[in-house]
Regions:
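Short, ordered, surface-exposed loop/turn motifs in non-cytosolic proteins
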Residues: 80-82, 226-237
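Glycine-centered loop-to-beta-strand initiation motif
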Residues: 109-113, 247, 251-265
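Short, aromatic- and glycine-rich surface loops/edge beta-strands on solvent-exposed regions
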Residues: 121-132, 267-273
Length: 305
């Protein structure tokens, strides 16, 4: 499925917004982006990390946007400390504190992440949001979101639990990773992604930056530390800013899936778990919980020289 026309419209809209806010004072810009991004999860928008370079030099200054959008086209969120539980850069094979860089900022910063790329090898940018509670205005919006993410019977489950169809509440949390290849030609393909123990996590089981480029990417989905079988994974392939292709896959019994790669493209892999919250009828807590995983990387068109 290709999103050319829709992508062009969204890009034009975002550019118009950026032109407007460019002339606002910093505090007004921060407020605008905070308000602008609040309602986006209601339309099941993805959340992902996009670094300023997927292949930086060692110790290069680097930024990372936290993007909220759909079909790999989105608006950058601002840095809001209260909405962040984890924001780190993990160096290649990072097991010691010296190879772990905490990413911090000031309220309203955009891009939200500023860092130094660090030592050569495959590094991982990790972002975990704080839990956020939302309310769907009607059952149709909830059903559309659930079906898009592979939970066709969620609304039936909701009714079977005796819950109201108006003002359906959900608590959601996001877990995003981005893979970057740091260093010159001598480090092409060095390092690997790894399971970090996030509540939901996508792990690339091959290095996307190796040369010659990979023909396909094996990924594994984990939930609560265990491989997750029979789960939907959505892959967005960005050929250029106005040409994004979307495909859906299912994990096997070991939580694995595999999809084709093309050189010179950016990739966003997304998966969501939607599950009922226990005791939602008796308590004031949300009726549903969703946890989101995303993984971004690039497949190089030419070897880095």
């Amino acid at each position: 499925m290709i999103f050319s026309a829709a992508g062009a419209v969204l890009i034009a809209a975002v550019k118009r917004v950026v032109r407007i806010i460019r002339h606002l004072p910093k505090w007004a810009t921060a407020v605008f982006w905070f308000v602008f991004t609040l309602p986006l999860p209601l339309q099941a928008h993805e959340f992902w990390i996009e670094p300023s370079s997927f292949q930086p030099d060692p110790d290069q200054s680097l930024t990372a946007d936290l993007l909220i959008g759909t079909d790999f086209l989105g608006a950058p969120a601002i840095y809001v400390p209260d909405q962040i539980e984890k924001f780190v850069l993990l160096g290649s094979g990072a097991k010691s504190q010296s190879e772990r860089y905490e990413i911090s900022g000031r309220y309203g910063d955009r891009p939200a992440g500023k860092m130094t790329s660090g030592s050569p090898g495959l590094s991982i940018i990790v972002h975990q949001t704080a839990p956020i509670r939302l309310t769907y205005s009607d059952a149709k919006k909830f059903d559309e979101f659930a079906r898009e993410k592979g939970f066709d019977d969620a609304l039936v489950q909701h009714q079977d639990r005796g819950l109201p169809l108006s003002k359906i509440t959900e608590r959601y949390q996001r877990y995003a990773k981005s893979l970057i290849a740091v260093g010159g030609p001598e480090k092409i393909g060095a390092g690997r992604d790894r399971h970090l123990g996030l509540a939901i996590e996508l792990v690339a089981e091959a290095n996307p930056y190796q040369w010659p480029p990979l023909q396909s990417m094996p990924v594994r989905l984990y939930a609560d530390g265990e491989p997750l079988a029979n789960a939907q994974i959505t892959v967005f392939t960005r050929h250029n800013p106005r040409h994004v292709e979307k495909a859906k896959y299912q994990t096997d019994r070991d939580g694995r899936s595999n999809f084709a790669l093309l050189a010179g493209r950016d990739y966003l892999v997304d998966s969501v778990i939607l599950r009922p919250m226990d005791g939602a009828i008796e308590s004031s807590d949300a009726m549903w919980e969703s946890i989101w995983a995303s993984l971004t990387f690039q497949v190089p068109k030419n070897p880095k020289m």
